Design a protein with these regions (language model features):
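A generic structural signal for beta-strand entry/edge sites
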Residues: 68-72, 82, 117-119, 162-168, ...
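Short beta-strand/loop motifs in extracellular/secreted proteins, especially
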Residues: 83-85, 98-100, 177-181, 188-192, ...
């Protein structure tokens, strides 16, 4: 699956005819390229008691960049029936007392805060891929839709400017590609320029603001920025929010 190849660094060989490949399959392939280092760990390796009839496996992959860190969790259900399980922070190597923003990569769905533990459903013969990012006091990156690892390969740097209340960064992808960057903040913040060119939604779970920033790669690098303001302040009138 794209999830397994995306979270692992092993070589990938393709036997497809790229000229006849369905666009949807081609998009999946692009989400596992380029290849990234480090292997995921089996989070349930020493706790699994039924390896014959219960084919449910959990993998974790902590990712660290100079600009930030997050944890990926892939849950594979190879059973022919749906399964429900409990994700535990300790199992994933995370602090049980810390709140994390939780995002479902394949469903493109923000799942609110994760703290300590949470029950999840996994469809039959399927998998779910979650990204956990420690909650910050300012807007931050939630995910991207360009790579399974959601920032390790395609986000070169991210910077929050407290004085200017601006989140900015550099994205890298092949020229001609398109993608989306997902940002998140608590309800104390709002985008400063009437959401120009972006999609903005408010979570019903925790009132968090989720912003989808479209990126178009005319060459292999895009520099972007989004200006914010306190949610109780009047909006700014006119200025580009993304460069």
């Amino acid at each position: 699956s794209a999830t397994l190849f995306g979270i692992s660094p092993s070589p990938v060989f393709f036997g497809d005819d790229f000229e006849r490949m369905a666009p949807s399959r081609f998009e999946l392939i692009k989400k596992v390229l380029p290849r990234c280092p480090r292997m995921p760990e089996a989070a349930d390796l020493f706790t699994k008691t039924d390896g014959r009839t219960d084919f449910l496996r959990v993998f974790k992959l902590p990712i660290q960049k100079e600009w930030g860190e997050w944890t990926l969790c892939a849950v594979f259900n190879l059973n022919e029936t749906p399964r429900t399980m409990e994700l535990d922070a300790a199992m994933l190597g995370m602090d049980a007392k810390t709140a994390y923003w939780m995002y479902d990569f394949w469903e493109e769905h923000y799942l609110g805060h994760f703290k300590g533990r949470r029950r999840i459903d996994i469809p039959a013969i399927s998998c779910r891929l979650f990204r956990f990012t420690e909650v910050t006091s300012h807007p931050w990156v939630l995910s991207t839709d360009m790579h399974v690892r959601q920032g390790e390969c395609e986000l070169a740097d991210i910077h929050w400017d407290e004085k200017r209340m601006t989140l900015s960064g550099t994205a890298i992808r092949a020229a001609g590609e398109r993608g989306n960057l997902l940002l998140v903040s608590d309800d104390e913040w709002m985008e400063a320029h009437f959401n120009k060119g972006m999609l903005v939604a408010k979570s019903a779970d925790d009132d968090a603001l989720v912003i989808k920033v479209p990126l178009e790669f005319k060459d292999d690098t895009v520099h972007w920025q989004v200006e914010f303001m306190p949610s109780d302040a009047p909006r700014k009138k006119s200025k580009k929010s993304r460069g």
